[in-house]
Amino acid sequence: MTTATTNPSTYPNAMAVARYVGISASKARRVIDLVRGKSVEEALDILRWAPQQASEPVAKVIASAAANAQNNEGLDPSTLVVATIHADEGPTAKRIRPRAQGRAFRIRKRTSHITVIVESRPSREGRRGGAGESAGGARARRAQGSKAAAAKKAPASSSKKAATTTEASEEAKGGSQ
């Protein structure tokens, strides 16, 4: 793996590149899309349980980038986030598979280059509200508010509904005897 330090953003960062990985770039991208923007710890957790074969080399590159950030740049591993991650196509090895009647089909063994840049971003625990707030937090508050509103309306309507269902069940019992 190749390592280097780049500075495309204002946050301190570190980089790792795995070249000639024996996975096609399209299959690696399926896994990469799962972890883009996540913290390094969360990304490694996701990849540990991902069933795809590409998750192992992607996890190795992320772990390498995190180690580079810690050892070379002196960054705190708990604040690292997968800022940039992408898979480019590498060279394709061509092989032949013999087929019936003297034919031969071509097998393309594809490789890829996986690049990861991790950044040390401040934790979000200290911040509340504002533009940096996650959509999940706002969604949870909206859901909680609607549940409270539904609870205020529910006692009256649920008692009417319960009364009608018991009357209907009594009629059904009385009519069948």
Curated annotation (Swiss-Prot):
Swiss-Prot/TrEMBL GO biological process terms: translation
Q: Which Pfam families match?
A: Ribosomal_L22 (PF00237)
Q: Which SUPFAM superfamilies match?
A: Ribosomal protein L22
Residue ranges under compositional bias (Basic and acidic residues)? 121-130
The molecular function terms in GO held by this entry are: rRNA binding; structural constituent of ribosome
This protein's GO cellular component annotations are: cytosolic large ribosomal subunit
Q: What UniProt keywords apply to this chain's record, in alphabetical order?
A: Ribonucleoprotein, Ribosomal protein, RNA-binding, rRNA-binding
Per UniProt, the ranges with Low complexity bias are 145-167
Stretches for region Disordered: 118-177
Q: Which domain of life is it from?
A: Bacteria
User: Which InterPro entries has this protein been placed in?
Assistant: Ribosomal_uL22, Ribosomal_uL22_bac/chlpt-type, Ribosomal_uL22_bac/org-type, Ribosomal_uL22_CS, Ribosomal_uL22_sf
| Cited PANTHER family | CHLOROPLAST 50S RIBOSOMAL PROTEIN L22-RELATED, LARGE RIBOSOMAL SUBUNIT PROTEIN UL22M
Which NCBIfam families does the entry link to? rplV_bact (TIGR01044)
Q: Whom does it interact with, and what assembly results?
A: Part of the 50S ribosomal subunit.
Protein role: This protein binds specifically to 23S rRNA; its binding is stimulated by other ribosomal proteins, e.g. L4, L17, and L20. It is important during the early stages of 50S assembly. It makes multiple contacts with different domains of the 23S rRNA in the assembled 50S subunit and ribosome. The globular domain of the protein is located near the polypeptide exit tunnel on the outside of the subunit, while an extended beta-hairpin is found that lines the wall of the exit tunnel in the center of the 70S ribosome.
Write out the similarity annotation. Answer: Belongs to the universal ribosomal protein uL22 family.
- Name-wise, this protein is Large ribosomal subunit protein uL22
Gene that produces this protein: rplV
